[in-house]
Amino acid sequence: MFNNDKDDNNQGNENNENNKINIKTSIDMGNYINSSSLVESFGSGSNRNNDKSEDVEYDDDDDDDDDEIASTEEEKESDLDSDSDLAPTQIIVDDSDDFYNNNNGGGGGGGNEDISSTSPTLITSNSFNDKINQIFSRGGSSLNSSFLNNGENKINFKQLVKLKSTLKKHEIPSRELTVEKEIGQGFFGKVYKARWRGKSVALKKITLIKFRDLTETEIFDKEVSIMSKLCHPTCVMFIGACSLDGPSNDRSIIMEYMEGGSLRRLLDEKSSYHLPPSLQLSIARDIAEGMNYLHTNFKEGPIVHRDLTSSNILLNSSYTVAKINDFGLSKEMKPGPTEMTAAMGSLAWMAPECFKAENYTEKVDVYSFAIILWEIVTCRDPYNGMEPLRLAFLASVEDYRLPLNGFPPYWVELISKCWNITPSLRPSFKEILQILNQIESDPLFLNLNLNCSSNNTSSGSTSTSSGSSSSSDNNLTKSSESNNNLRESNINNQIKSNKNSSKNGYYAQDINDYSLSMQVETKNCIYNNVSDNVNNNNNNNNNNNNDNDFFKSSFTKKSFLSNNNYNNNNNNINNKNNNTNNLNDNLIIKSLNHISEQNSFLVSYQDSNIVKYFSLDNESLTSTLQMEQSVVCMKYQIINEKVFLVVAMSNNNISLFELKKTDFSGSANSPTTLLPIKVIKCDEQRHTIKDITWNGTHVITSSFKDSSIQIWDLEKSLYPISKMDNGGVGILSIDSQSHQPLMISGDSDGKVKLWDIRNSHCFRTLTHSPPSSSSGGSIGVDSVLFRSPHAVRDPIILTGSSKDCKFKVWNMYSSTCLNSFQSHNKDLLGIHRNQSSQQMITWSSEGTISLFNSGNNINNQNNQNNNNDCGNDNDSVEFSKVLNVNSMMSNEPLQSAQIISKNRIIFSSKNKFYSIIA
């Protein structure tokens, strides 16, 4: 659909060259859906907002109209396939913007800024300085808000209101509109500059066919219904709507045109300098006034913006008026019980309660306002050198906040209140306006503003006498000159405890503390021959301590419910033979499912409705459960200390069971018929279930047949609440995290996708196995797992392919492949992890099991709040050993395996299963 424009004059690329995988546009990964926004364009060389993502190659893999937002470029060999990482809000070059011309030098440098300086320096553009001088000459040392309201903005506002009043039902005939050019592009559509009755207007055309079960018409009507109610000088005015002529009959919204573009554009363009204190205060006040209007002016209840970002704040040509724009995601809170849990907005500005899909109120806008204040003071983007999804996790889980070192105390106090982790403790916008009035009379603010005014006047006169801007530039202090020393002194002290945080959270010490510029080289571990040495082991092999040997195979084995007796004292075998009549020899084991909380596991069988319960405490079968149909796949969850099992049946039903202790008190020889709590009938003709996962809130099913993922709410609905189309690509495996909205899928084309199930959106794609002519096409990803299903701080995901036998370890924050292992020779049937032991295994039908250890202890990470960077980008996985168990199984194929405790593995072959201690 569109590509990023390259910035030929981009400065500071040295710092970002190695950080190509970071996506830092206004929405980035997660899409956490952003509506279209009127983002004004730059002149040549000023596309700063997209510089951070312009090096990423976008590959068009998703055919679903709801999710596809990036165009296809020439595919390169890379572990990262960021086809869905492109932000919905993109900046389109507008060469006719008279203010941003070549005199600006393509934007300020990309160096680091010294925000601790007591004398903020002005931005350098002579045109901007001249406009500020005019304002200073009228308002003295501070911007006079009454002048702003009574000036050009008020006149233009009244003119538009008068024109608007002549319309009937907001309808504007398309013949009255002259579309001049495209100036922006967003998630819901495109924005154009147009002329209407002699006035410049912005025309927003809705092009998205469907979004979250809303049709194009419903999307259009929703935004119009909100915008048509608004009439305030600090909200972009809705003028009318029209249907454009043409076969598509597209509907468009006509809005007020703001010549100055977005606040984000201004801050990106002048990122090496400070805005004047008075301008900071003026912009903050305008935003607060507009938001106070939205939250308090309507009898029906507040209008929650839900996407308040610097890209959605538009400025007039002199930057003296800021207006709130883009109400595509806004929601009216009607009287009566109101519940909002859908994640909306852009990651850096998203309140923690919104990201975690908790109930939230209008206070999410106050949190977003705090982030905008931080941007205004620093002229920096709020991702702070971090990958967006990682930033969102840190803010919501660890109470991470952006650095406030060097900020004036009045801003520190206000920002800290606005982004408080507890929404009820955040001030209202009415209270914020009172605080802003107090700041205007603060002695420190007056002093800073006076110094800034003096510097500006001096630089202006110098510029006039010299006929160039070089003299005024010499009076300015670039942020990069002093911030380097600050960063060097803080390199070993990156995190600062926040004593005011109710969760013992922390602030970043410096703007660049969390740079993800380091690339981790993928290493490959390949072995060629695995000898069978279970029964043929000798003491020499057991005593081999050569650390360079890749293959280590000494272990103790136990045979559970097996007809085979092993008597080999050299291998320290502990025989335990149970009654083999407990198993039906005609049943072939399909899968083992370890229930760590009960120290037991469930055994399912191929083409059978029998599930057997095995207790590890007494190492015996205790019960046989009989289902209504044969089991396809199953997953369990612990909810309120109760064990629940969700099972996909061969008749395509989804059944929910509670596994009570009484269910396991019977005999293994007499099956107990287990009645489901709830049964959901799935459409077998279309969505034939191949895999199932359960995050404790939603059951998620995947189908290879219709290439889709369906989300089910077991409590509220008998029908899927959402469907995610995978664009015709078969889905082989899925996994999710407990009580988190993230899930991953492994596809038949060798791709791994990360999904946000709240928005039914694929926000990132990784390439596990690129297409290969030698392999006869794509290599599917048969196994995907989160390494820590319950620890949201762990960014590691695990992927495996049966065809190429590769086991890969990824950091989902940075989309970096940390490790790649050639773990088997024949095939790779699955991956299993044990969070308590921090170990994982892969297994192959050839009779080999590969054991791996985590590089760091995730449990220790979860207990450290103030002195550890959660995420641990280098938290890789280490290979331990390969175990060959062919002789134990009499050379029968290995079918399933689980690691149940430290170095203890259970596995199955035909109708038997075994235990070994590696």
UniProtKB/Swiss-Prot annotation:
This is Probable tyrosine-protein kinase DDB_G0283397. GO terms for cellular component: cytoplasm. Gene3D superfamilies: Phosphorylase Kinase, domain 1 (3.30.200.20), Transferase(Phosphotransferase) domain 1 (1.10.510.10), YVTN repeat-like/Quinoprotein amine dehydrogenase (2.130.10.10). Belongs to the protein kinase superfamily. TKL Tyr protein kinase family. One of its GO terms (biological process) is signal transduction. It catalyses: L-tyrosyl-[protein] + ATP = O-phospho-L-tyrosyl-[protein] + ADP + H(+). ATP binds at I183, G184, Q185, G186, F187, F188, G189, K190, V191, K204. InterPro entries: Kinase-like_dom_sf (IPR011009), Prot_kinase_dom (IPR000719), Protein_kinase_ATP_BS (IPR017441), Ser-Thr/Tyr_kinase_cat_dom (IPR001245), Ser/Thr_Kinases-Pseudokinases (IPR051681), Tyr_kinase_AS (IPR008266), WD40/YVTN_repeat-like_dom_sf (IPR015943), WD40_repeat_CS (IPR019775). WD repeats lie at residues 626-667, 684-722, 724-765, 776-820, 823-862. GO terms for molecular function: ATP binding; non-membrane spanning protein tyrosine kinase activity; protein kinase activity. Residues 10-24, 35-46 have a biased composition (Low complexity). The active site is at D307 (proton acceptor). Residues 56-84 have a biased composition (Acidic residues). Its EC number is 2.7.10.2. It comes from Dictyostelium discoideum (Social amoeba). Residues 1-122, 457-504 are annotated as: Disordered. Residues 177-445 form the Protein kinase domain. Keywords: ATP-binding, Kinase, Nucleotide-binding, Repeat, Transferase, Tyrosine-protein kinase, WD repeat.
